[in-house]
Swiss-Prot record:
<feature type="repeat" description="WD 2">
    <location>
        <begin position="530"/>
        <end position="570"/>
    </location>
</feature>
<dbReference type="GO" id="GO:0005654">
    <property type="term" value="C:nucleoplasm"/>
</dbReference>
<keyword id="KW-0539">Nucleus</keyword>
<dbReference type="InterPro" id="IPR019775">
    <property type="entry name" value="WD40_repeat_CS"/>
</dbReference>
<feature type="repeat" description="WD 6">
    <location>
        <begin position="813"/>
        <end position="843"/>
    </location>
</feature>
<feature type="repeat" description="WD 5">
    <location>
        <begin position="758"/>
        <end position="797"/>
    </location>
</feature>
<protein>
    <recommendedName>
        <fullName>Ribosome biogenesis protein ERB1</fullName>
    </recommendedName>
</protein>
<dbReference type="InterPro" id="IPR028598">
    <property type="entry name" value="BOP1/Erb1"/>
</dbReference>
<comment type="subunit">
    <text>Component of the NOP7 complex, composed of ERB1, NOP7 and YTM1. The complex is held together by ERB1, which interacts with NOP7 via its N-terminal domain and with YTM1 via a high-affinity interaction between the seven-bladed beta-propeller domains of the 2 proteins. The NOP7 complex associates with the 66S pre-ribosome.</text>
</comment>
<feature type="compositionally biased region" description="Acidic residues">
    <location>
        <begin position="163"/>
        <end position="172"/>
    </location>
</feature>
<dbReference type="InterPro" id="IPR036322">
    <property type="entry name" value="WD40_repeat_dom_sf"/>
</dbReference>
<comment type="function">
    <text>Component of the NOP7 complex, which is required for maturation of the 25S and 5.8S ribosomal RNAs and formation of the 60S ribosome.</text>
</comment>
<feature type="compositionally biased region" description="Pro residues">
    <location>
        <begin position="379"/>
        <end position="396"/>
    </location>
</feature>
<keyword id="KW-0677">Repeat</keyword>
<feature type="region of interest" description="Disordered">
    <location>
        <begin position="364"/>
        <end position="419"/>
    </location>
</feature>
<dbReference type="GO" id="GO:0000463">
    <property type="term" value="P:maturation of LSU-rRNA from tricistronic rRNA transcript (SSU-rRNA, 5.8S rRNA, LSU-rRNA)"/>
</dbReference>
<dbReference type="Pfam" id="PF08145">
    <property type="entry name" value="BOP1NT"/>
</dbReference>
Length: 843
């Protein structure tokens, strides 16, 4: 009803001089049209048993002589008790008749011509003087006929009250039967509110039915719209200033201070609406019974499964054709053979001659021609930028000063031919005034400007990358964990493989030094050196003629001969250590000036029984031990901040039990010393502090070179073990706590040749393999990384570095991962010590 009423209001504004009675009649006719479409949706209706000639046609209103009573067009219909409607439909507004309107039927005639809602579009001019029932809606197949007021029957004896029946009892029918003016039965149904989902809701007769038409269109009228019966809704009277003040003082419940735009009256809120607003204001849930904390159902787990859920073999039905599908295909084939299914249906050709349209092929007589050999395609326009947007970013918009400067410039001097402009929406963008000129200039450029073909360099990006060999070609290198060594309590700080490659020595936080069989992981020997201090470093003496193990525990260095060798080798090892005691006795009685600042002592009887034969008390904690290649010297470094610079680096002579401090002053720049190593073939000592590495010639007692890796804090370094006079010792690898692995070519520069950043945490140790072109590093992220690093004697070629493998197995404990590693002297094996208290052999 809203749409029909709204349409009439626009019609009323265009025809202000049309009488109001005609407007109301127009509304009633539109109501019949909309009611007919609603009747189509009903499954059963009271008119189902009537003949086609006795179905209702139309009703009309007689407004002659000031009468505004509706008359019903009816026809005598026999009562059919079998026709009962189970649906509810509102025809009360269409069937309401006044009983006293029959007397005025002959005074005036109202003729309605046209079909408002029929589908056939034909006028039934031949049928006249047919009486229509006043309570039914015409069917879809019957158009409205011309109805004259002379044939309109009188109305009802009594008017309807317009109230809905009480349908609380399910057994009662949803209609009531009354007698019309001709004595026939009329089925009266309760009205249905079209704005409500329920069919039993009451109709608000005072509701405004103007729809979406603004109320401003009614400013010049005394009314603000029409109700469902077509009557005007008068504009409510507005209170004065005093009434508004009293209303603001005495605020009723549900008062909002707003005006309802559809009625013009104050807008009142119901209790449910107030409760809804309160919940929204308090940030509560508006829906009753809604639980925001329902338990979540995890459809997927957070654990990534590596193995399949089911390893069952594939069933046989996966590999054989389906019999069911074969039957369906044969059905289709049979239908195609019988002609019931056409595999291809040719499209129907349109006969253009019948429609009077002549068509022809524009390119029928032309064949494609190849482009000219010197043809150059037209250059494409550059893509638009942000400044050409209708809503560009603020930084692209010019200010007043920039706009004035742009306007004062000549067109040739302007950087661009337009100014960026901001519009809120795309529909507000006007036409571009320079559109035609820009297209004209583009056409001039296309056919007047000469084109030049420029050759571009087609370079494959992969060709710029260095060609590295495949890791499969660089085998052997360690890939898997072969042996696990368990026994230490706490972290394993250091380990070392003896020169024969049979035994593995390790030291940890529990103050013990343990010797293992490398291949089996069986513990062969152990000694408890301290109950409080940890074993920081363990290193084997190079050479196979004697077996001597040096260990740093606390502020002392212990020299031991493990009870794992035969008697001859054990006697030779004891002779190497005991040779120094005789030298110390002879020098004590002589007048020589060479005296050791540190006195070597014999251990306690308990340690001597365990295999410890000498103790060197340094006074400070040594974190690094490195042997000379001949096995008679080893250097120790005490990197503590409290250690004096003069005693931080010490060189010890095993055959003389002599300790010397070569550096009397702290190294310039770079902080305290960290690690020291002897050159594998030359009398050069490399000393690394926090930021630099210095090379000293021990024979000449001079500084040879200073390397600057660029790291913040050097943790370890190693020298390439090749004995070639051209390449031996010329390359170093440096590990730092800032996660960088650096390769130094000493002859090339004092800066690193390569910097590798593959670890996520600090690098603890780096090590070259004695014979294979391999090196590795360990990190606190719990991984070892194996690299291939080949060095040649050709000065024109650089080192070739290839990443090979990442080994993971140690657990990160206390933010510490893998603390130390060592290589097997002959095989491509390595061992690692972790903070998780284990050692691992990688093969």
């Amino acid at each position: 009803m809203t749409a029909s009423s709204g349409g009439y209001q626009g019609w009323e504004r265009r025809n202000n001089n049309i009488p109001e009675t005609v407007g109301i009649l127009f509304l009633q006719v539109r109501a019949v049209s909309s009611g007919k479409k609603a009747a189509q949706c009903r499954e059963t209706a009271p008119t189902a048993g009537l003949s086609e000639s006795s179905r209702p046609r139309l009703f009309a209103m007689d407004y002659s002589k000031g009468s505004k009573k509706r008359k019903a067009i009816t026809k005598d219909v026999d009562e059919d008790p079998s026709v009962v409607s189970g649906d509810e439909y509102d025809l009360e507004a269409l069937d309401r008749n006044d009983s006293d309107s029959s007397a005025d039927a002959s005074d005036s005639e109202i003729e309605l011509i046209g079909d408002f809602s029929s589908d056939d579009g034909e006028d039934d001019d031949g049928e006249d003087d047919d009486e229509l029932d006043s309570d039914e809606v015409p069917s879809d197949t019957e158009p409205f006929a011309r109805v004259k007021s002379g044939n309109i029957a009188t109305g009802l004896d009594g008017s309807l009250d317009g109230e809905s029946n009480d349908l609380s009892d399910d057994n009662e029918p949803n209609y009531r039967i009354e007698k019309d003016a001709n004595g026939n039965d009329r089925y009266i149904y309760p009205e249905i509110n079209p704005d409500d989902n329920s069919e039993y809701s009451e109709v608000d007769e005072e509701a405004n039915t103007i729809g979406d038409i603004p109320l401003s269109f009614y400013d010049q009228y005394p009314h603000i719209g029409y109700n469902i019966n077509g009557k005007k809704i008068l504009r409510p009277a507005k209170g004065q200033a005093l009434d508004a003040l009293l209303d603001s003082i005495e605020i009723p419940k549900g008062w909002t201070g707003l005006t309802d735009p559809s009625t013009g009256k104050p807008l009142q809120l119901s209790q449910e609406e107030l409760e809804l607003l309160r919940k929204v204001q308090m940030n509560e849930i508006t829906q009753d019974g809604y639980d925001p904390y329902q338990p979540t159902i995890e459809y997927f787990t957070s654990k990534q499964e590596i193995m399949p859920l089911s390893a069952a073999p594939e069933p046989k039905r996966r590999f054989i054709p389906s019999k069911h599908e074969a039957k369906r295909v044969m059905k289709i084939v049979k239908a195609i053979r019988e002609g019931r299914i056409l595999p291809y249906k040719p499209p129907e050709e349109e006969d253009a001659t019948q429609e009077g349209i002549q068509t022809y092929d524009l390119w029928a007589d032309e064949s494609p021609r190849p482009d000219h050999p010197m043809n150059i395609p037209a250059p494409k326009l550059p893509p638009p930028g942000y400044e050409e947007s209708y809503h560009p970013p603020p930084e692209y918009l010019p200010d007043k000063k920039e706009k004035e400067e742009w306007e004062n410039q000549d067109e040739e001097d302007r950087e661009r031919e337009y100014l960026p402009t901001d519009y809120s929406t795309l529909r507000k963008v006007p036409g571009y005034e320079r559109f035609v000129k820009e297209k004209f200039e583009r056409c001039l450029d296309l056919y007047l400007a000469p084109r030049v073909r420029r050759s571009k360099l087609n370079i494959d990006p992969e060709s710029l990358l260095p060609k590295l060999p495949s890791p499969e070609e660089l085998k052997p290198f360690p890939t898997t964990c072969a042996t696990l060594f368990r026994g230490h309590r706490g972290r394993v700080r250091s380990l070392a493989i003896d020169p024969t490659g049979v035994w593995l020595a390790s030291g940890g936080d529990d103050g013990t030094v343990r010797v293992w069989e490398l291949l089996t992981g069986r513990q062969l020997w152990s000694v408890k050196l301290s109950d409080e201090d940890a074993v920081n470093v363990v290193r084997w003496r190079p050479g196979k003629e004697a077996v001597v193990l040096a260990a740093s525990v606390g502020d002392s260095i212990y020299l031991a001969v493990p009870d794992v060798v035969n008697l001859e080798l054990e006697a030779a090892s004891l002779e190497v250590i005991d040779a120094g005691w005789g030298y110390a006795t002879s020098t004590g009685t002589s007048t020589t000036k060479k005296t050791s600042p540190v006195q070597w002592t014999r251990p306690a009887s308990s340690l001597a029984d365990s295999g410890v034969y000498a103790v060197i008390p340094l006074g400070y904690i040594a974190k690094s031990i490195s042997w000379h290649r001949r096995g008679d010297y080893f250097v120790t470094v005490c990197p503590g901040t409290s250690t004096p610079a003069s005693v931080a680096i010490a060189i010890h002579t095993l055959s003389k039990h002599l300790t010397q401090y070569p550096f009397r002053r702290r190294l310039k720049g770079g902080g305290s010393p960290q690690v020291a190593h002897f050159h594998p073939s030359k009398p050069i000592l490399f000393v690394a502090n926090q930021r630099s590495i210095r090379a000293y010639d021990l024979s000449r007692q001079t500084l040879v070179k200073i390397l600057r890796p660029g790291a913040r804090w050097i943790s370890s370094f190693d020298i390439h073990p090749t004995s070639s006079s051209t390449s031996g010792g010329d390359n170093l690898i440096v590990g730092s706590y800032d996660r960088r692995l650096l390769w130094h070519d000493v002859d090339l520069s004092d800066r690193p040749y390569k910097t590798l950043r593959y670890h996520q945490k600090a690098i603890r140790a780096v090590k070259y393999h004695p014979h294979y072109p391999l090196f590795a590093d360990t990190s606190d992220d719990g991984s070892l990384q194996i690299f291939h690093g080949s060095v040649t004697g050709d000065l024109l070629s650089n080192a070739n570095i290839v990443p090979l493998k990442v080994l993971k197995g140690h657990k990160v404990t206390g933010d510490l991962g893998v603390l130390d590693l060592d290589w097997h002297p002959r095989e491509a094996w390595c061992v690692s010590a972790g903070a998780d208290g284990t050692c691992r052999l990688w093969m």
